[in-house]
Amino acid sequence: MQESEGVLYMRVSFRIALAGQVIGVSALYEQTRTFCKNYLTDAPASFEVAVTPVDIAFEREKNDREAAVEGHAPGNFSDEYLETLALYRKIVERLLEWDTLLFHGSCISVDSKAYLFTAKSGTGKSTHTQLWKKWFGERAVFINDDKPLLKISAQGVTVYGTPWDGKHHRSTNTSCPLKAVCILTRNTENSIQRIDKKAALPMLCQQSYRPCSPIGTQKTLALVDRLGSSVPLYRLGCNMEPEAALVAYHGMNQ
């Protein structure tokens, strides 16, 4: 039990497995354990994190600031929802110790090889990967439709599913070798080209979660640089017709 500003909170404790590590979680709300239900484990924890009311207040203030910058009204988010954001923030900052970073993109695998699509919000990442699912059927598996984890090693990059999977809730508790990263742009015609790390790096940095601490930021940027050197990089100009999925797939498998 924890007291904050005169309010008593019953702690909710559980463990989850993410990106090859087991995290001991101390949360404020039972809904957070339910949110993580597909990742629960009884294995010993690699490290532990605890969410506090201060963490939830930080998430609310952050969302309000971002809404103001974008000219939107503040979101009326529940404390339970904001706790899930605070929890992921704490986890991913610790996972940097294991060369693992959070990346904003939609990741789908075909025949056990993962393809990660990234772009500015609203470009159509999820719409595009849904086209892959329609084309490839059971061969295609959504790893994570919004915030996958990428573990970078000398053997390559492995992508992991997480329960933080966007508004469509498309994810799988699995891992898969990352075949390629593709920067998606809108176009009237479908075309794909391979690009070098220098061309891709600004978007890769923008779409990677960077902690506030200088050490965490430095570690993240080093991992992003390694990511750009570890897998092929592409730029896809596409419309939302089904053929866009085939153009992308064949372009990354030449």
Residue ranges of predicted features:
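Glycine-rich, often acidic-flanked micro-motifs
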Residues: 6-9, 13, 19-35, 77, ...
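A metal-dependent hydrolase signature that marks the N-terminal structural subdomain at the beginning
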Residues: 11-13, 22-23, 27-46, 52-63
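Short, intrinsically disordered, mixed-charge
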Residues: 41, 93-97, 134-137
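Charged, amphipathic alpha-helical linker segments immediately N-terminal to NTP-binding catalytic cores
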Residues: 43-91, 252
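Glycine-rich adenosyl-nucleotide cofactor-binding module
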Residues: 74-121
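Conserved glycine(s) of the Walker
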Residues: 124
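Post-Walker A alpha-helix
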Residues: 128-129
